[in-house]
Amino acid sequence: MARVSVLQLETHFPRIAGDVGCAKTFQCELEIIIVPNATVAKVVTKDPSQLDLRPFQDALSKATGDLITTSCGFLAPLQSVLKPQCKVKFIASALGQLKTLSTLFSPEELSIITFDADKLGAAHLPAGCAAFELSIFGLDVRSHLREVISNDLPTLDENMASDDVCSAFEKATTSKTKAVILECTNLPPYKPSIRRVKEIAIYDILTAIESNLPNSVNPQFL
């Protein structure tokens, strides 16, 4: 059976079905490798050049999957650094899909929904995609889901989190929006709720994994 390895931040908040860190999300085996000291506060930063790469390189060396990914979209810049060290397919972030999607959608037609819109910027986007920096929208700073993730809380109200994501989605889209990318790997569980607001093309870490390792993701989460 195929295996997906996830280099996961050192967090304890709930990872529900649809999250890249939950075994129920996949049809294949899931291997979780915790990256020591890689907290949300350290990784969610405006300046990814300040990231300490060594813990991620160590975690990568332990991975045994047919595909290796991470649990945070802010790690997008690691694609160019870690991929050459990887013998299998490596996906640092859902944002890696933007390079291809930028040939299909304009910044006006594609929105990026992130955990923290104040910190995600051009430095996290693929080369040639800086124009999409204006398409970035985030969770409300006072939202329940953001509080759970930021403070690494042990409990999550899924209904409140769903409302938070739908609220961010509504602010991120207009009548011209044709697609969205969910940067944050904790957002895919709420795709059914998003689609009840508006039927739209949704790209996230799971669609990236599935396109590179077919039949790995449980179809209900695509």
Regions found by a protein language model. Name each.
Residues 1-51, 114-156:
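N-terminal glycine-rich anion-binding loop in soluble enzyme alpha/beta folds
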Residues 12, 69-79, 94-97, 115-119, ...:
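Gly/Ser/Thr-rich loops at beta-strand to alpha-helix junctions
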Residues 49-64, 163-176:
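Short, well-structured alpha-helical segments in soluble
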Residues 50-59, 74-81, 85:
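N-terminal active-site wall of soluble small-molecule enzyme domains
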Residues 76-88, 190-198:
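Short Gly/Thr/Asp-enriched flexible loops that form oxyanion-binding sites at enzyme active sites
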Residues 87-95, 109-114, 199-208:
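Short hydrophobic/aromatic-enriched beta-strand-loop microsegments
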Residues 160-194:
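Charge-patterned, long linear interaction tracts outside catalytic cores
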Residues 201-222:
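Short, flexible loop segments at boundaries between secondary-structure elements
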